Amino acid sequence: MTYLLAPLVAWTVAQTAKVILYSVRAGRLNLRVLAVTGGMPSSHSAIVMGLTTAIGKHAGVASPAFAIALIFSFVVMYDAAGLRRAAGRQAAILNRLVEDLVHMRGVQEQKLRELLGHTPVEVLVGAVLGVAAGLIL
């Protein structure tokens, strides 16, 4: 059960922290952040590191399951901080180009979501939450 509980607790703590941080910043409760990707902390990092830590703690760091979970965690965190963040930057540039087209020709397009990935700090904080949940549970 710990293999499920640790990542779920890590995800819940990360998502709760995200709601609190964004609500304080906005000055009002903002539950919409629960349904979007990106932001502080990374719940993706929290959930995979919670699972990896629970496996390491209970099955051992020399187990095949730990090795698989660790590699999986690295892939997820690299994707969150690298690829999805780059896609978010590209979306920001495309949105500026579309704004220019609106002003020049009146072309109207839907804006792309820009907050897709995480900064390295957001990934690190999520990973720390996951490790903590895995060690505590």
Which residues make up each language-model segment?
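N-terminal glycine-rich anion-binding loops that anchor highly charged ligand groups
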Residues: 23-28
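Feature marks short, highly hydrophobic, charge-poor N-terminal signal-anchor/signal peptide-like helices
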Residues: 1-5
